[in-house]
A protein has these predicted regions:
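Compositionally biased, charged N-terminal/linker segments
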Residues: 1-36
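Ribonuclease/tRNase effector modules and their secretory precursors
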Residues: 3-5, 15, 99-109, 116-121
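Short, charged beta-turn/beta-strand-edge "cap" motif at the junction between a beta-strand
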Residues: 29-31, 46-51
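Short beta-strand-centered aromatic/proline hotspots
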Residues: 50-59
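Short, solvent-exposed secondary-structure boundary/capping segments
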Residues: 58-75
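Glycine- and charge-enriched low-complexity intrinsically disordered segments
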Residues: 71-114
Length: 121
């Protein structure tokens, strides 16, 4: 059964996901993250009506392993491997990284049927 998840995200990463420049969202294994599965829908708070389909979920032991496998451009476009590793380790220190590194492959959904409060006049 498809579930809808509502999460927070920084504006720069939201814009990259929506434009398709960034296709992978990285999180660690907090309980709410572990619930996300292929086929679910993710929406991000504070950016209006937006939905992303979860195309796939992959799990890694470390951030470095994830970057080596997935590639930097899909995760943090425009950064070098070293800069991406540093950025993600600042967001997720070792104690959080130990929860598992979750990679969510997301695709922005074009919504033909938006709620009335979001419809244009």
């Amino acid at each position: 059964m498809t579930k809808k998840h509502i999460w927070r995200i920084k504006r720069i990463y939201f814009d990259q996901l929506k434009s398709g420049k960034k296709t992978l969202e990285i999180r660690v294994g907090y309980p709410q993250i572990k619930k996300a599965q292929k086929g679910d829908i993710i929406s991000f708070k504070n950016y209006g009506f937006n939905e992303f389909d979860v195309k796939d979920v992959r799990i890694y032991q470390t951030i470095a392993e994830m970057l080596d496998t997935e590639g930097v451009e899909k995760v943090l476009p425009g950064l070098t491997h070293g800069a991406a590793l540093h950025t993600l380790q600042r967001i997720y220190p070792k104690d959080r990284e130990k929860l598992g590194v979750y990679v969510l492959e997301l695709i922005f959904k074009t919504n033909r049927f938006r709620p009335k409060k979001y419809k244009r006049a």
